[in-house]
Design a protein with these regions (language model features):
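Non-transmembrane, juxtamembrane loop and terminal tail segments
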Residues: 1-12
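Membrane-spanning alpha-helical segments of multipass transporters and channels
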Residues: 10, 19, 26-316
Length: 316
């Protein structure tokens, strides 16, 4: 028996078939180098985190940029985990379905296996964030520990992206199409999250993206509204030499602020005038986001099961 085929389906029950397929996927993790997604994900997380990690959860700008970048890492990891796992063995799935395989057992086994992968990737990502000097939020919003809230969010985002890619893998017929579709899914998640681009009349689309809910959750957990804002000060510094009727009023003001040790007070004041209700550190801003991500997981799972239910009729 090769690792691309399952054990003989001597059990007709869904639970027993679930165990058979889960063991198969675990063997493939070892013998077919599926473990490679872990170091690849770690490298991507390291590249991003070492660039934006120092200011994440320190300033409002750093938190916005850092959480969005971290969410993108999670989405990428999730997509890469499962975008090819079904379509690469589509013929085998079709054959075994005709022999009595339960599609629900097969999909749930994939989901259990992918959950293990996503959990490991979450631990690796948190470790890399720690090494990169990320200042984890100490008090949590949902739990007592901010790092736990952060870990739950990272796991949910990664897993939702993973199951979305699993759904796509069930819909397409080969790995070439799957890898062609994946960049478009990534672009959709990045652009339509609403975090960096003004969507205008299309703003309602952001609620359909995993990245939107993930970034918002991390900003809430990171206590965005309690952090200083530095962009106003940096803008004023750029214009410090601006001449106004032979005077440089901004330069005098900036020098006075620094001389009197009021810079930190100014940055905190700037932050307090840039509060966002959606980022207030309360459970009501986190739990709905987690719920939205879980709902997406349920929808992706349902579509994946339905798609494979009709695999016998697939003439492609």
């Amino acid at each position: 028996m090769t690792e691309t085929s399952t054990e003989k389906l001597q059990y007709t029950g869904r639970f027993h078939q679930f165990g058979i397929y889960l063991r198969k996927f675990l063997r493939m993790f070892v013998y077919q180098s599926d473990w490679v997604v872990l170091p690849i994900g770690a490298v991507i997380a390291a590249l991003v985190t070492f660039v934006v990690g120092n200011n994440m959860f320190v300033t409002q700008e750093g938190t916005t940029m850092g959480t969005f970048a971290l969410t993108c890492v999670c989405v990428w990891n999730g997509f890469f985990n499962s975008i090819q796992v079904v379509c690469r063995e589509r013929d085998i799935v079709k054959k075994e379905h005709r022999a009595g395989m339960h599609i629900t057992s097969y999909i749930l086994a994939h989901m259990a296996y992918q959950l293990i992968l996503c959990f490991l990737q979450t631990l690796i990502t948190l470790l890399i964030c720690h090494v990169a000097g990320v200042h984890f939020p100490k008090p949590g919003v949902i739990t007592k520990w901010g790092i736990v809230d952060m870990g739950i969010t990272i796991l949910l985002v990664t897993y939702a992206a993973d199951i979305m890619a699993l759904m796509v893998s069930c819909l397409v017929r080969n790995t070439t199409i799957a890898m062609t579709v994946m960049p478009f899914l990534l672009i959709y998640q990045l652009i339509f999250s609403g975090n960096f681009f003004d969507l205008g009349a299309a703003d309602f689309i952001k609620v359909t993206t995993i990245s939107h809910w993930g970034s918002d959750s991390l900003c809430v957990i990171g206590r965005y509204n309690e952090q200083p804002m530095v962009s106003l000060w940096n803008t004023l510094v750029q214009f410090k030499d601006a001449d106004f009727y032979g005077e440089k009023p901004l330069l005098y003001v900036l020098q006075a602020v620094e001389k009197n040790g009021m810079l930190n007070d100014f940055l905190k004041w700037s932050g307090q005038n840039n509060l966002k209700p959606a980022y207030e550190a309360i459970p009501a801003n986190v739990l709905p986001a987690w719920g939205a991500i879980l709902l997406m997981i349920v929808i992706f799972t349902a579509v994946a099961v339905i798609a494979l239910k009709f695999i016998d009729k697939d003439k492609r």
